[in-house]
């Protein structure tokens, strides 16, 4: 059984160096960076340590590992911050840095002794090189010499130190938990993690790196990826955090884009290349590769270029914006092309999936369907499959002694109070400001709740969001000043500014009377799932922003609100506190069903199953793997068949709207003679399928009397003579199936007028936007992408197909397959006697009839005469080769 390579920017594990054991080294571990800064909010709110002291909540002394909280998809670690003063507190051993706690992770972060980053700011260096006058930078040589000396000392220091593997404190904890759950439930047999260590590694010697890699591979099934500190600084802290993250969440920052997007693109590519190289080196036939999230969007195509047959899946955990936002990325094409190296791409919601398909259509001009991107040589499946929490893990920790103890104390401390709870990192995207403003409005509008209702919000403050933290502080101060009673020690808003342990976090969720998540945009928010699992007894309601991925999942149970509407959110708070028992139970039951159904384990096994199914299906359509259509391939079964149906199409190579005479000059006589031989055999029923109109097609095949014809890609059928049906054209569509034509004509005309040199061509059954002769090719491509996206999003009954130099708009309810099915059910006498079907074609319009024949109960042969991804089960090298086989069959 093959291995499952699970790629995430960080491994679930990291390394702790025990430098305090070295002789002469008496330094203690460095202080935590984020604890140096204290904002005004701390003075207006009660710190978690103060609360725990006041409530006599003891911390667990057990040695049991505490899992990482799932609310935080990734840690915004600052261990690569440049200023030494920001890295350390007090004296430090040279070359050391502190692993910063995860801002907003919601748990205590163990402090590991690890190397300090050797990175210089890539963006600053490159911007200086870009705009500086000659000679600038010469004075840096002494600094570089000192840096080399310091690096040498650090390498020697860490090489002599003992180290241990520890559970990491940064990374996609939701993914980590999900994989652990799938392994526990036997849904995943042989996972192998691929990622970074979550710490700077330039100060480590090759010997140390190899030892660490070996230990993690053997004991922890983890493949370590190494990259330079500078590359990671540019990749993660600049390109990912300041370019991709904000824009993916509809917070595009033009200033950051100007300074970081192009300057840090090479770093993003370099880190992705390091992952791809590790995968390529270790991949074996039968293995699967599962790439996770926006940090590694280029990896799928990098691997595909080296291993064309690899099984590659990609899952995007964050939200995916509309095409209007995504096209703002300077490297939008490269990002999408990197993603399209996958066999399967997964998203949290149908909305994100639709946005991705639209982006591919508008940016890459790729043909797309509801759940698929069609490329020339293959296709990519796209689907929505939301991640979930692990009920088994949560239930286990709910029974933990510390959880029960904290819960008991909280219940006593806040008895007779209504408790709203929120858990978010301090980030404008999380909507803490909107939540506080709505709570303030709630207290103003409902005086009866002013003295008996509180909001407890956990939020870790970071230097990165200092200004936002000050704004939050102002609102908290205003609310507590207006509605607080300091004589009674009553504060309506409590900001817990330090991380909670996992038991404390679960205890807080379990005592909540309502849980409020008001993110302005978020991929999923697993805090909602965990809240539901903690409420089996109390059954408190959930208030969720409509802009979170889980909103659609909990639509039948939670209060779905617009966080921008202060009034709507305020009213939802009151409704949550005044629910009847029956409604409360029903809402909770609906939410619990969702959480249990969409569990973490089911998510992992579902993705793995879908990935393998997609790869298998795509392999069957791989043109290079198809058998050649020869006399030996079909001859025996053809000879023994008593009744045969042949549907042949030569449009793609032989007949086009502009090149029909080429077909006539080179193949016409040969084709007519072979078709005449086929029709002369009473066992054969022969149809020619084409995109041509009735008169053109009938004129072209006038020298083959009795042949059946399918015109305009299935809109009309002229029966084969042997069916004893009057040979007149039969229309296979109803007039209402063409209602899309009139409005579509105006849309295409609009794009044609704004694209000089382009034209609208009406083919009867279809319409075409042709920009082959457009004065500006780029303008034509842009118009084509917008047109295809607009039609596929808004028009019913038709779909736009981007082709080379044109966009073909065709009906969705009419095809060669519908015509073939009509022939089978209405025109062929005694269809049950049919024992062989042969379908051959050479362009994309034949794929539907290939699929139809493949699903038929009758023995079928489907043959592609073109090159590319196809539903056909065999191929030939063009029309002449196919004619030669037919000629041999007639002999």
Swiss-Prot record:
Region (Glycosyltransferase): 132-613
The reaction(s) this protein catalyses: D-glucose 6-phosphate + UDP-alpha-D-glucose = alpha,alpha-trehalose 6-phosphate + UDP + H(+)
Region called Disordered, residue ranges: 88-126
InterPro entries cross-referenced by the UniProt entry: Glyco_trans_20, HAD-like_sf, HAD_sf, Trehalose_PPase
Top-level lineage group: Eukaryota
Modified residues (Phosphoserine): 108-109
UniProt keyword Nucleus, yes or no: no
Keyword Repressor: no
UniProt xrefs under SUPFAM superfamilies: HAD-like (SSF56784), UDP-Glycosyltransferase/glycogen phosphorylase (SSF53756)
Similarity-based family: In the N-terminal section; belongs to the glycosyltransferase 20 family.
UniProt name for this protein: Putative alpha,alpha-trehalose-phosphate synthase [UDP-forming] 100 kDa subunit
Organism: Schizosaccharomyces pombe (strain 972 / ATCC 24843) (Fission yeast)
């Amino acid at each position: 059984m093959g291995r499952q390579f699970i790629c995430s920017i960080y491994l679930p594990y990291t390394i702790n160096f025990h430098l305090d054991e070295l002789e002469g080294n008496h330094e203690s571990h460095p202080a935590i960076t984020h604890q140096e800064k204290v904002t005004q909010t701390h003075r207006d709110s009660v710190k978690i340590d103060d609360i725990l002291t006041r409530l006599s909540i003891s911390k667990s002394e057990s040695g049991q590992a505490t899992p990482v909280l799932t609310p935080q998809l990734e840690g915004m670690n600052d261990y690569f911050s440049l200023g030494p003063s920001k890295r350390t507190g007090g004296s430090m051993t040279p070359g050391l840095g502190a692993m910063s706690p995860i801002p907003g992770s919601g748990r205590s972060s163990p402090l590991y002794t690890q190397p300090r980053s050797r990175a210089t700011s890539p963006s600053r260096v490159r911007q200086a090189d870009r705009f500086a006058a000659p000679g600038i930078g010469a004075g840096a040589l002494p600094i570089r010499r000192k840096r080399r000396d310091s690096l040498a000392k650090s390498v020697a220091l860490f090489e002599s130190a003992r180290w241990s593997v520890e559970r990491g404190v940064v990374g996609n904890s939701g993914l980590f938990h999900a994989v652990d759950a799938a392994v526990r439930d036997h849904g995943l047999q042989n996972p192998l993690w691929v990622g970074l260590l979550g710490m700077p590694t330039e100060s480590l010697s090759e010997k140390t790196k190899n030892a660490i890699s070996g230990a993690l591979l053997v004991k922890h099934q983890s493949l370590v990826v190494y990259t330079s500190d500078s590359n990671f600084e540019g990749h993660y802290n600049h390109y990912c955090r300041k370019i991709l993250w904000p824009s993916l969440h509809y917070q595009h920052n033009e200033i950051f884009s100007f300074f970081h997007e192009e300057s840090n693109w090479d770093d993003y590519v370099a880190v992705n290349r390091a992952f791809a190289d590790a995968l390529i080196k270790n991949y074996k036939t039968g293995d699967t590769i599962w790439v996770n999230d926006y940090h590694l969007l280029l990896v799928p195509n990098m691997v595909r270029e080296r291993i064309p047959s690899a099984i590659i899946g990609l899952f995007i955990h964050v939200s995916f914006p509309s095409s209007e936002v995504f096209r703002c990325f300077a490297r939008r094409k490269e990002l999408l092309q990197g993603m399209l190296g996958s066999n399967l791409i997964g998203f949290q919601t149908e909305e994100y999936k639709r946005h991705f398909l639209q982006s591919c259509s508008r940016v890459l001009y790729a043909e797309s369907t509801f759940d698929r991107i069609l490329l020339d040589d293959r296709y990519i499946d796209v689907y929505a499959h939301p991640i979930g929490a692990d009920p088994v893990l949560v239930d286990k920790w709910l029974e933990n002694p510390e959880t029960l103890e904290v819960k008991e104390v909280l219940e006593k401390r806040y008895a007779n109070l209504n408790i709203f709870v929120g858990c978010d990192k301090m980030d404008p995207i999380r909507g803490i400001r909107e939540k506080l403003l709505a709570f303030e409005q709630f207290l103003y509008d409902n005086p009866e709740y002013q003295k008996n209702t509180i909001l407890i919000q956990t939020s870790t403050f970071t230097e990165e969001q200092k200004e936002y933290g000050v704004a939050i502080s102002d609102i908290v101060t205003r609310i507590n000043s207006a509605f607080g009673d300091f004589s009674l020690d009553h504060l309506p808003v409590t900001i817990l500014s330090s991380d909670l342990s996992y038991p404390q976090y679960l205890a807080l969720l379990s005592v909540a009377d309502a849980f409020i998540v008001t993110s302005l945009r978020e991929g999923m928010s697993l805090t909602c799932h965990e809240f539901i699992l903690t409420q089996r007894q109390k059954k408190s309601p959930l208030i969720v922003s409509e802009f979170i991925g889980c909103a659609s999942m909990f639509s039948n149970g939670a209060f779905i609100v617009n966080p921008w509407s202060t009034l709507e959110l305020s009213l939802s708070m009151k409704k949550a506190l005044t629910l009847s028992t029956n409604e409360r139970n029903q809402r909770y039951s609906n939410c619990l069903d969702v959480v249990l159904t969409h569990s973490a384990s089911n998510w992992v096994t579902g993705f793995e199953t879908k990935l393998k199914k997609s790869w298998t299906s795509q392999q069957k359509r791989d043109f290079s793997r198809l058998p050649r259509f020869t006399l030996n391939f079909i001859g025996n079964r053809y000879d023994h068949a008593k009744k045969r149906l042949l549907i042949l199409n030569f449009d793609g190579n032989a007949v086009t709207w502009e090149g029909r005479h080429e077909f006539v000059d080179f193949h016409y006589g040969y084709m007519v003679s072979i078709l005449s031989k086929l029709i002369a055999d009473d066992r054969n029923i022969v149809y020619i399928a084409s995109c041509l109109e009735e008169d053109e097609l009938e004129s072209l095949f006038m020298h083959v009397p009795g042949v059946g014809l399918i015109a305009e890609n299935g809109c009309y059928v002229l029966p084969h003579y042997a069916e004893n049906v009057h040979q007149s054209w039969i229309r296979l569509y109803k007039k209402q199936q063409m209602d899309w034509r009139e409005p579509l004509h105006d849309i295409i005309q609009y794009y044609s007028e704004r694209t000089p040199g382009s034209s609208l061509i009406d083919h009867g059954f279809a319409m075409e936007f042709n920009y082959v002769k457009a004065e500006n090719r780029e303008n034509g491509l842009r118009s084509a992408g917008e047109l295809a996206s607009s039609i596929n999003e808004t028009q019913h009954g038709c779909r736009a197909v981007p082709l080379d130099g044109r966009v073909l708009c065709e009906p969705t309810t009419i095809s060669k397959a519908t015509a073939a099915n009509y022939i089978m059910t209405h025109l062929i006498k005694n269809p049950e006697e049919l024992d062989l079907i042969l379908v051959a074609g050479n362009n994309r319009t034949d794929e539907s009839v290939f699929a139809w024949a493949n699903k038929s109960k009758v023995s079928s042969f489907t043959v592609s005469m073109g090159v590319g991804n196809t539903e056909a089960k065999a191929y030939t090298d063009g029309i002449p080769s196919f004619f030669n086989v037919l000629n041999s069959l007639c002999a």
